[in-house]
Amino acid sequence: MGIEIERRFLVDGRYDKPWRSGNYSEMCQHYLSGVSHIDGKVMWNEIQLIEEEEVLENLTTWRIRLSGDTVTLTAKGRRVGATATDYNWDMPMEIYNSLPLDGLPSVEKIRHYWTGEDGLLWEVDEYEGSISGLIIAEVELESEDQEVALPNWLGLELTHLKGWSNASLSMMIKDSELN
């Protein structure tokens, strides 16, 4: 189990985009409901995703991310402040390809990696599809009170606001498709 401490911000993309000068990866994230953990097996839709002997409790969000040829299963707990429980497992591509993912809440984005003047790595997500134009930046921290040099292209801080997680955005997209 890990602990994720991060701050998230809207990005003002009308001006220079220095984050585009570095490395990036394309990602598709699918959000799962009805995931169970029984006898050391994490199951969804009667398909075994992974094996995990550790007790998994108080997890609220399950996600499968495809980035290049890497598939990652992630489970997160409820966020308190800037902190949440965070589990990550590599998943075989064969399992990913066998999953019925069509119709699931999903987001597609290009993630840029940009190093700030304080040496911290920023992940800047430029969303695709129906929320194209939305840009959110996040930075992982060692503690909630860690000092951060905030780039001048940041806008509103989203860290403590509900409705701006990737899971929430995926549900918003899904809801809009149904209307």
Which residues are covered by each model-predicted region?
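Phosphate-end processing signature that detects enzymes handling 5′-triphosphorylated RNA
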Residues: 1-179
